[in-house]
Amino acid sequence: MFEIKVSQEIKDACPVFAGAAVYAAVKNTAYCEGLWKEINAFTEELTTTTQIEDIKHQPVIAATREAYKRCGKDPGRYRPSAEALRRRLMRGIPLYQIDTLVDLINLVSLRTGHSIGGFDADKIQGAYLELGIGKAGEPFEGIGKGVLNIEGLPVYRDASGGIGTPTSDNERTKMNLGTTHILAIVNGYNGKKGLKEAAEMILSLIHISEPTRPY
């Protein structure tokens, strides 16, 4: 288990911020048919009921974008992951099929608008994480993105440095088929509303996709 702290700089910039964490023992799989039926159903619903210009106004996404501005980042250049995923689907580009754990985190993010950090808990260094604001020149290798400029982005740090932002998580702590413990953090830059439901959705999808032992 981990202690998760919120720095004073985040409290000052984002006073209503709240978060929820899920820690579970898991057995990852390459693909889950039932999960992808849900992803495809959501994709159809989104693309038939939403306009691409409306995505940034979804309340949770809008709050995350506002947090970026308060922390010093342009959300038009560095989009929160939930916004980027929805925009991808609206452009007719399917989600990447990665593995079951990554795919279910993406689904919950899509459904709720929350940017969610999904980490291999055994790769996290130390016993606690702290949410702060990225500094100039701070090293961070985004998953599939290469070196990411995290200056002005909210960032979770472990004992070795940054592991997750609302735009991208770090290659160092990413999940893969060998992951046996997951830490998922739901970020509520609009406050507590919807956090419990998002965390429960993550646990439910984990149970559906593969028997697990939640803590």
Predicted regions and their residues:
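Conserved phosphate/anionic-ligand binding catalytic regions in large, soluble enzymes, centered on
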Residues: 94-119
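Mobile "lid/hinge" segments at catalytic clefts and subdomain interfaces of large enzymes
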Residues: 19, 166-199
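A generic local secondary-structure boundary/capping motif
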Residues: 8-13, 96-99, 120-121, 142-146, ...
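Single conserved hydrophobic/aromatic residue that forms the stacking wall/gate
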Residues: 206-215
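A generic structural motif
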Residues: 25-30, 94, 186-193
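Gly/serine-rich nucleotide phosphate-binding loop at the start of the catalytic core
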Residues: 11-42
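A structural-propensity feature for long, helix-poor, extended segments
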Residues: 132-168
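Glycine/proline-rich, flexible active-site/cofactor-binding loop segments
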Residues: 31-84, 90
